[in-house]
Amino acid sequence: MALTLLRGMRTPVSSGSNPGLFFAVLRPRLSRFTARAESAQATEPKAAPPPRSIQLATKEAAEQKTQGFEAVIGIETHVQLSTVTKAFCSCPYSYGAQPNSTVCPTCMGHPGTLPVLNEKVVECAVKLGLALNCEISMTSKFDRKQYFYPDLPKGYQISQFDIPIAKKGHVDLDLPVEFGGGHRKFGITRVHMEEDAGKLLHSESSSYSQVDLNRAGVPLLEIVSEPDMRTGIEAAEYGAELQRIVRYLGVSNGNMQEGSLRCDVNVSIRPVGQSEFGTKVEIKNMNSFSAINRAIDYEISRQILLHKEGQADQIVQETRLWDESSQKTFTMRKKEGLADYRYFPEPDLPEVVLTSDYINEISKSMPELPEAKRRRYENMGLSMQDVLFLANDDNIGHFYDSTLEHGADAKLAANWIMGDIAAYLKDEKVSIDEIKLTPLELSELIASIKNGTISGKIGKEILAELIAKGGTVKGVIEEKDLVQIADPAAIEAMVDKVIADNPKQLEQYRAGKTKLQGFFAGQVMKASKGKANPVLLNKILGEKLNAN
């Protein structure tokens, strides 16, 4: 089918219009799901979401009824780097900027322009390669990956083909406890540098699609895994671990909703015990890790059903789109093979030659990574549930470590962060680095409870104020007169008064209704405004209630 393209036409910038390049809508190539996924208007930048756990299906739902088959899953992950400028030109990139406002002749593919490699891209690639336990190539090169699409202005993408910058690595992770837990090790085939394409903007109300080339030339690192995963949960956790790693390294914000981290999943099935792979199907359009889990589980079920119905020949090598509304995958296009891309060396860029000193300097600057942090926390005696919560977010891990540096008990600090502080972060939808509480004051709060200066109940009230308003533990205690009453005589006097004021309850208690001790304790705490030492209170109260 012939398609007419209006090349190079650009609309004036005005209210109600979009300065994108116009192309006839490519109906045969694009599905209705793609069209719905993109807005025809520029999207405003969004703040990074607060830390949260991956919402996956239950363990029982994740266990596929494979009926003698096993899934083979590999993932290609594209990580958009947080560099100041693009990969091969000096244009900046800002998510949500006005379409076609951060472009130049180089990233728009004008004739006669030449690429110049951004050194920061190489540094990020080496960092990620080391973090993934890869072999770093001392010499690598760029290649042209050629295909036609309106968002690819040069008609080819600068990538790496046969000599990537890193290869033969692995990633370690721990599955959540609710899914059975356990350690997993997944192989990494390669990490290579490349540039991003532009972005097609579709509108169902128009017969044209627009092209925004702001993203064209933005540096990417593609991470290709070995086909080592067997379930949707494993694949989702693999993607989440890569996100944690790039955030720990600072090479990318890893935000899936901005396209900074994109996962394309390859799924096939085969009879258990068979060494040969089945027909591989690629799945795209998954914008969360829970969507990755659900898309894979659906695709496994679809392929098993076709095998059971004698229609295995209908499983073809293709690209399918995940549709969130129907919870199904749909055919997008036939999958290209390597020969279709006609790779050949990029003649306008020299080889990338590294030295041992350069790699060693980068290695020395590497931060502690998620896997090392998990093992350190585990050796401190924390449960795996605590370990995963604290280590899975770099900001939370840093806050926790800083609290320990100020002398806080490891388990008590973990309990406070995972309890009241985590609840506040969830309710207010903020990150831990946005609250006014400091690690020093959390350690002071824990110490004040431990040494009896304040009670745990008062501690919770102080914590809430410190989180919202800031300040110091000592200052709040003095300002509100919250020092715990630990004088036995003072507590005994309050106990005597409460017992005297409640003769009926005293009679019921001594008749066998011993649960009423909680009533008396509550009345004393009320009289003391929550400041009575609870251990001392219960001791004195028990003696008084049981006295003859």
Swiss-Prot record:
Superkingdom, natural source? Eukaryota
| Catalytic reaction(s) noted | L-glutamyl-tRNA(Gln) + L-glutamine + ATP + H2O = L-glutaminyl-tRNA(Gln) + L-glutamate + ADP + phosphate + H(+)
Compartment(s) where it occurs, according to its Swiss-Prot or TrEMBL record: Mitochondrion; Plastid, Chloroplast
* Stretches of the chain forming a coiled coil according to its record: none
Instruction: Indicate whether Mitochondrion appears among the record's keywords.
Output: yes
SMART domains referenced in this protein's UniProt entry, alphabetically: GatB_Yqey (SM00845)
The answer to whether UniProt assigns keyword Transport to this entry is no
In the record, biological process GO terms are: glutaminyl-tRNAGln biosynthesis via transamidation; mitochondrial translation
> What EC identifiers does the entry list?
6.3.5.-
Q: Name one GO molecular function term.
A: glutaminyl-tRNA synthase (glutamine-hydrolyzing) activity
- Could you give one GO CC term from the UniProt record? glutamyl-tRNA(Gln) amidotransferase complex
Primary enzyme class: ligase
Other notes: This protein may be expected to contain an N-terminal transit peptide but none has been predicted.
On subunit structure and binding partners, the annotation says: Subunit of the heterotrimeric GatCAB amidotransferase (AdT) complex, composed of A, B and C subunits.
The UniProt entry's sequence similarity note says:
Belongs to the GatB/GatE family. GatB subfamily.
Could you tell me what this protein is called? Answer: Glutamyl-tRNA(Gln) amidotransferase subunit B, chloroplastic/mitochondrial
Instruction: State the species of origin.
Output: Sorghum bicolor
Organism classification: Eukaryota, Viridiplantae, Streptophyta, Embryophyta, Tracheophyta
